[in-house]
Amino acid sequence: MKIGIVLYPTFGGSGIVATELGKALAVKGHEIHFITYSQPVKLGELRKNVFYHEVVPSDYPLFEYTPYEQVLTSKLVDVVKYEKLDVLHVHYAIPHASAAYMAKQILQSQGIKIP
């Protein structure tokens, strides 16, 4: 399977769990795509079936904080379409799950289904 994993790439528990899950799935032959703003700290070197897609937060002067959720949504749509992902595994409800939900709606409007 081609699996996208959305996570915080830091040393926190959820980020470690998601990274280790992806690495274990890669060992079993799955193609893993980590989608986040920085390479996960526990990822180490990329392998032939492990990819990292950087989400670059835009700097928009109107907002006090960068609109990460919207940028992540756009990146998820792009990665699902161009890498032909089978599934997204998403850690954290906000902003990751809400971004994944928006991406799913956009993809469905284009005839692309992802669970």
Describe the role of every protein-language-model region.
Residues E54, S58-Y60, E64:
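Active-site donor-binding segments of glycosyltransferases and PAPS-dependent sulfotransferases
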Residues M1-V41, K48-E54, E83:
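N-terminal subdomain of nucleotide-sugar transferases
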Residues L62-V87, A97-S98, M102:
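An amphipathic, basic-hydrophobic alpha-helix
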Residues V87-K113:
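An aromatic- and histidine-rich active-site surface loop
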Residues I32, K113-P115:
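Hydrophobic/aromatic residues located in beta-strands of well-ordered beta-sheets
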